Regions:
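A short, Lys/Arg-rich alpha-helix, primarily the initiator
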Residues: 1-33, 68
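Conserved hydrophobic/aromatic packing and binding residues within compact polymer-binding modules
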Residues: 26, 37-41, 51-54, 81
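DNA major-groove recognition helix of helix-turn-helix/homeodomain DNA-binding modules
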Residues: 1-2, 45, 64-80
Length: 406
């Protein structure tokens, strides 16, 4: 049998939407589209166990955030949702204190055309974007990328209403959203989409004279090159970012360390450590940091140096630097802890410390599975392969643990 051609015409599905019966909605949608819980979860940013729990009524859908993800991810026609969706000023996670009731009312009025776009409205949007950047550290990109895409669309719709300095500020906000969306696409190993968003971010940054964002976009393209094992391209993009006009010292430091990582990938240890040292000197003297570089600090630089050590097979210093970096990461940085924890396991495995490699792997395996796919998850698979090739029994233990979560 072929899937139902227009599922939203089906009376059962329309009834479920009208009643906000989320378990029935998910079950009926899957039945009509012949979809698995995993496929549905990927569309709405939920793991398969979460979909199962909702469908079996073991978990209630109570947050605005999850409702929005279901509506947006499944393409629920807004006429079925009605005013409940229109009342939302911007799609948002439920984050206390991010948008006050006054700001929410203001954003609703701006969206409906009853109030002119003003500085206070843009301040509220800035706060929302900043909060979601931090939330992504904890819940991962898969969970919120559709949500942030919806936010971007709302902000883009305001461009035609902005005048004078506000117009430039809207373009800057669009550049920040595009950079964040590019980062999340890259985090999900979707390079073509990431490059498209990076290009849009760079164009908007140039249009609005936003040197920090223009440099950041080039730095993130360097990061993408690094993730594809293109060391030479990583170096060149990092150096281009570092020379961008009107970029702050903090942004230059990020660019210089990217060049250093590219040199490490190419096996050029002297150039790698020289640029990494220079990046730390620059950031130490920096007085202003753009809001999207909130994670900057000694812990982050130690972790980056550990990454360079890994490329150069300096296992002892890699272990030391990664341990230092991880010790300074807040618990909310789940994605970063999963990634750098898996790199620490790699360093231990490279040094022949199989037991330590297994312990490091198991300490982050849950976060790697839940929010660290594909990068941290694939790194743990590489660690298992290294251990198995060395005939260490810990390799089979790790492999079995990974299979259990696959």
């Amino acid at each position: 049998m072929e899937p139902e051609p227009n599922v939203w015409a089906h009376p059962e599905l329309r009834t479920a939407v009208a009643a906000e019966d989320w378990p029935a909605l998910l079950k009926t949608w899957r039945k009509l589209t012949r979809s698995s819980q995993s496929k549905l979860g990927a569309l709405v940013g939920l793991a398969q166990p979460d979909i199962s729990a909702i469908e079996n009524r073991r978990r209630e859908v109570t947050s605005v955030e999850v409702r929005q993800r279901i509506i947006h991810g499944l393409g629920v026609p807004l006429e079925l949702v009605g005013a409940r969706y229109e009342e939302l000023p911007l799609p948002s996670l439920v984050l206390p204190g991010v948008v006050s009731e006054t700001d929410a009312e203001r954003l609703i009025a701006v969206k409906q055309g009853g109030l002119r776009l003003d500085t206070a409205s843009l301040d509220a949007m800035d706060a929302l974007l900043a909060a979601h950047r931090r939330a992504e550290d904890t819940v991962g990109s898969r969970t919120i990328i559709s949500l942030v895409t919806a936010q971007f669309e709302e902000v883009a719709a305001l461009y035609g209403r902005a005048r004078g300095p506000l117009a430039d500020r809207v373009v800057k906000l669009l550049a920040e959203y595009a950079q964040f969306l590019a980062w999340m696409a890259q985090d999900q190993d979707n390079a073509p989409v990431a490059l498209g968003w990076f290009d849009r971010s760079y164009d908007w940054a140039l249009e609005s004279g936003y040197g920090d964002m223009a440099a950041t976009t080039l730095s993130m393209k360097a990061h993408l090159a690094w993730s594809q094992d293109k060391g030479r391209r990583c170096v060149r993009l990092g150096e281009a970012a570092a020379s961008t006009a009107e970029a702050s010292e903090a942004t230059r430091a990020m660019a210089v360390q990217m060049a250093g990582r590219g040199h490490a990938l190419e096996g050029n240890s002297a150039d790698a450590y020289r640029r990494l040292d220079e990046a730390q000197q620059i950031i130490a003297a920096a007085s202003d940091t753009p809001p999207w570089l909130y994670f900057y600090g000694e812990s982050w630089f130690a972790a980056q140096r550990g990454m360079a050590d890994l490329h150069l097979k300096e296992w002892s210093s890699a272990t030391e630097n990664l341990l230092t970096g991880l010790a300074g990461f807040a618990p909310s940085f789940r994605r970063d802890r999963a990634w750098y924890g898996s790199c620490l396991a790699h360093a231990y495995a490279g040094a022949g410390e199989a037991e330590a490699a297994l312990d490091a792997s198991l300490s982050v395996i849950t976060d790697a599975s839940e929010i660290g796919r594909p990068h941290a998850w694939e790194e743990l698979h590489r660690v298992a392969g290294m251990l198995i090739r060395r005939r260490a029994p810990e390799g089979r233990v790790l492999c079995d643990a990974l299979v259990a979560l696959d």
